């Protein structure tokens, strides 16, 4: 499932994004953020993080540096 989403993002980056002017307000761009989110967190959480990011990418948000959060360790420290 994760590979399907990554494939969709790569298709967008290669074929759709070059035909449009750069409009992303963030660094890394939303598509790069999505790739990293899926690679770090898997399909479910990667999808959630990517959707949240895309919804923030509009003219009324200041944008800026917004990295993908690190994956939290599921182990409880003893």
Swiss-Prot record:
InterPro entries: Membr_insert_effic_factor_YidD (IPR002696). It is a peripheral membrane protein. Keywords: Cell membrane, Membrane. One of its GO terms (cellular component) is plasma membrane. It comes from the Bacteria. It is found in: Cell membrane. Pfam families: YidD. Could be involved in insertion of integral membrane proteins into the membrane. Belongs to the UPF0161 family. This is Putative membrane protein insertion efficiency factor. The lineage of its organism: Bacteria, Bacillati, Bacillota, Bacilli, Bacillales.
């Amino acid at each position: 499932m994760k590979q399907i989403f990554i494939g969709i993002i790569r298709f967008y980056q290669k074929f759709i994004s070059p035909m449009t002017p750069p409009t992303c307000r963030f660094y890394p761009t939303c598509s790069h953020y999505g790739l990293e989110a899926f690679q770090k967190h898997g399909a479910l959480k990667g999808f959630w993080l990517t959707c949240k990011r895309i919804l923030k990418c509009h003219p009324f948000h200041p944008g800026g540096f917004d990295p993908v959060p690190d994956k939290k360790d599921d182990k409880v420290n003893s």
